[in-house]
Amino acid sequence: MWLKSLTLKHFRNYQDAEINFHSGLNIFLGQNAQGKTNILESIYFLALTRSHRTRSDKDFIHFQEKDLKVSGILEKKTGTIPLDIELTAKGRITKINHLKQNRLSDYIGAMNVVLFAPEDLQLIKGSPSLRRKFIDIELGQIKPIYLADLSNYNHVLKQRNSYLKNSQNIDENFLSVLDEQLIEYGCRVVKHRLDFLKKLEIFAQEKHLDISQKKETLTIDYLSSVPLQDIDSIEESFRLSLSKNRKRDLFKQNTGVGPHRDDIAFFINQMDANYGSQGQHRSVVLSLKLAEIKLIENITKESPILLLDDVMSELDNDRQLKLLETISQEIQTFITTTTLEHLKNLPKDIKIFEISNGNIK
């Protein structure tokens, strides 16, 4: 798939803009704070209805405006697909082929993107929430039912935590009803995640062996807050964990176990990658990003769109080369950069946009 054109109305520092893209490599060149990343963010937003930079919808909207609209024309093997997202006072409106989508899980997945930004380099040493977010975003694109199950789980979790925090007299029977709902959706979430990581690991191992010149083997472990000796007994294990933690939950007024507390661990030659070098961290993250591309291609039979937000300068020549090899394999790619000096071995057929104070040339 590739994004043929993008139209922005009241998005960040773009009052009105329309851009036609190359089906291969597109480079946004300009100094910092000119609007390069805003364009990548708008493409990411068009695909996933969210930003990789902020949680607040208000941050998207152009100064002194009250709404925004991002539209794109997507080319896929099945044909041309118009996509639209609007943010208004009434909320968020998503459309595919000009038809309104009632649920986010109906919209997300129409356009698949893989983002590689400097903050992704914190994936290894950063907080568990970063790694859970990584799973949620990538898995949600290729398995919409995961988003529905995760949304239901988070709804019950919020309800349970609110009840623990605000009720003067806890009804143990009502809490048990909430527990059963939490178990139902929580088990689905964990099973989706385990299946995803198993598939991702296969491609990531292959990429990491190539990057490390066959010196390092990468493995990925899912660290569950609920014991996972047997996937078939996960429901009973979750139920037992909630029962054991009930006194703790009542005292702390929150839920101590479940997929919202889970984590991922990465190992290089069976040693925790958290203790590896900065170069090894970069190799692991690069392997994961390249593996995401292969996994999405394998499942959807379409290439995702690759977004590289000022990340090339973070990679040495060897890692840049591995990334550029992927770009040359007919994957539409968007790169933001302040200079072309560190971009070597680029394909000849590219499109360069010069960005200055929100103006595109």
From Swiss-Prot:
SUPFAM superfamilies recorded: P-loop containing nucleoside triphosphate hydrolases (SSF52540)
Cellular component terms (Gene Ontology): cytoplasm
Database matches in InterPro entries: DNA-binding_RecF, DNA-binding_RecF_CS, P-loop_NTPase, RecF/RecN/SMC_N, RecF_2
Compartmental location: Cytoplasm
UniProt record, GO biological process: DNA replication; DNA synthesis involved in DNA repair; double-strand break repair; SOS response
Pfam families referenced in this protein's UniProt entry, alphabetically: SMC_N
Signal peptide segment: none
Keyword line: ATP-binding, Cytoplasm, DNA damage, DNA repair, DNA replication, DNA-binding, Nucleotide-binding, SOS response
Top-rank lineage group of the source organism: Bacteria
Positions annotated to bind ATP: G30, Q31, N32, A33, Q34, G35, K36, T37
Coiled-coil parts of chain: none
An MF annotation (GO) of this entry: single-stranded DNA binding
Role description: The RecF protein is involved in DNA metabolism; it is required for DNA replication and normal SOS inducibility. RecF binds preferentially to single-stranded, linear DNA. It also seems to bind ATP.
HAMAP family: RecF
Family indicated by similarity: Belongs to the RecF family.
Protein name: DNA replication and repair protein RecF
The encoding gene: recF
